[in-house]
């Protein structure tokens, strides 16, 4: 069996057993298919879709088939619009911390 088939098989098997699935591949779909589909998700799991790809002119999608997987998963992030805003916040915080470090100021503590 080719290694690609083994990789796909193992990915499906591992995802099906997982309580948490985080997908961040951002790969183009084959024949319009999503990387993560409902049959790969354990009922009640949490699915975080970080992957981001262009699917057409001005159209974007994540790695996860949101419509199908949301019927199986207990929690799921939409994409686009799910994890992106949090990524921007984290990046901006890192820029501020780097600037403070550069001029000799201590890293500011922020309440969680």
Q: Model-found features: residue ranges?
A:
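Internal active-site segments that recognize and position negatively charged phosphoryl groups
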Residues: 1
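Rossmann-like adenosine-cofactor binding region
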Residues: 4-83, 87-97, 101-104
């Amino acid at each position: 069996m080719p290694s690609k088939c083994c990789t796909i098989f193992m990915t499906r098997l591992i995802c099906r057993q997982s309580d948490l699935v985080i997908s961040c591949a951002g790969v183009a779909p084959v024949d319009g298919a999503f990387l993560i589909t409902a049959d790969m998700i354990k009922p009640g799991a949490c699915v975080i879709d970080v992957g981001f790809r262009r699917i057409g002119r001005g159209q974007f999608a994540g790695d996860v088939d949101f419509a199908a997987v949301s019927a199986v998963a207990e929690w799921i992030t939409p994409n686009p619009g799910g994890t992106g805003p949090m990524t921007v916040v984290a990046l901006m915080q890192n820029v501020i911390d780097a600037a403070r470090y550069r001029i000799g100021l201590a890293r500011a503590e922020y309440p969680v």
